[in-house]
Curated annotation (Swiss-Prot):
Family matches, as CDD domains: GAL4 (cd00067)
Residue ranges, annotated region (Disordered): 63-90, 173-198
GO term, biological process aspect, one: aflatoxin biosynthetic process
InterPro entries with a match to the protein in the record: AflR, OAF3, Zn2-C6_fun-type_DNA-bd_sf, Zn2Cys6_DnaBD
Compositionally biased region (Polar residues): 74-87
Ranges of Low complexity composition bias in the record: 179-197
Function: Transcription regulator of the gene cluster that mediates the biosynthesis of cercosporin, a light-activated, non-host-selective toxin. The perylenequinone chromophore of cercosporin absorbs light energy to attain an electronically-activated triplet state and produces active oxygen species such as the hydroxyl radical, superoxide, hydrogen peroxide or singlet oxygen upon reaction with oxygen molecules. These reactive oxygen species cause damage to various cellular components including lipids, proteins and nucleic acids.
Places the protein is found: Nucleus
Keywords: DNA-binding, Metal-binding, Nucleus, Transcription, Transcription regulation, Zinc
GO MF annotations in UniProt: DNA binding; DNA-binding transcription factor activity, RNA polymerase II-specific; zinc ion binding
Name the record gives this protein: Cercosporin biosynthesis regulatory protein CTB8
GO cellular component: nucleus
Amino acid sequence: MAKGSAGDAPNTRDTSFKRPKIRESCTHCSSQKIRCTKERPACARCVNKGLLCQYNISRRTGTRRHSVRATPEPETTISNAPTSSVAPDSVKIDGKRSPAMSDFALLDGLETFDNSLWHQPITTDIQDIDMQYFDFFDPGGYQAEPEPINSFDIDSTLLCGTSTAGYLPELDAEASTRPSSSSSPPSQRSDGGRATTHGGGGCISTALQIFSELHVSSSACPIAAGAPSHNIREFDHVLDSNRAALEKLSSILDCPPCCHDQEVLTALFLAVQKALSWYSAALDVAGDGEPTSPSSRVKSPPAFLGSYALGAQAQTLARAYVVMAQLQQHFQPLLAKLQRISSLSALGARSSSTTSLSSVSSLQSSTSGSAVIECQKRALQEALEDVVAKIEGIKRG
């Protein structure tokens, strides 16, 4: 009888103890709301994706027990199911006893990261990186690398066709092929903190706005008499504003429906001529130590090379050097594109007017528009010749 009573004691203890219930779905399938195939020790989805398949303890405990067990559950219950593992948040795992399990537990949530973070585009093209070049006047004022001094020699080759009356000298044969900052996307350009988008008014509104920013009203104008005077500008500000204006005008020429519109081309020619007038005024700059003439619109602080102050003649030559470099890199490619598009637009207007001879009004408007553009071409060529002549005069000294 004693043996029988002793053998019945373990059975009574086993019936009162309930083993924790393992969930039927693994951790990864339940977190993704996907039906688990429930294979043990690892489901098919985790095996295919190379994931660590874990079957956690179910948190549904059912009815609450009246008495709480004073002694903690033995850790040997986990060893009874060697094919299943327990989540780190439900059971603490000793890293000394099971280092492999603790390492995998740290990697459990890596699949929740967005893989697109590892595929972000990385800029490797040096043309997309804004590299500043040394400037005599402002370290951040001019970013174009100037040409050597001997590049002041001007070729007598015509840039445009022979249909125009004026002669437009070619500044540099390599300027049209040199990469310009206007070829980069508008989102990657710098314009002194201002946006380079055209706004809601369209291309013609942008061209007229650039013309208005570059225009200086006459002091005798009664309408502009009460406006604040901004006639005198800094030399580096002229370079920055002209470069930004030429980049915007070049982007307008990339708009297919607007670049062939004669009204837009007229506004573009006006804005380009205003930018060229500021280059001409920058060559007549008066330094702080020089007397300022009444007609001078640009001033420049003294220039230094280290602690050495440049003389008046050296400063004048340096300004001509920088203006010539910016003409080669920004002005000449825009002018070549403008000449090519305006010539194609004029040919298209003539062909469309000859096919519809019944429309007399369209023929007259296209003829008058082409005549206006031709006049603007000649005026722009004459202004460019004056600027080149000033640079040659400064070079000869």
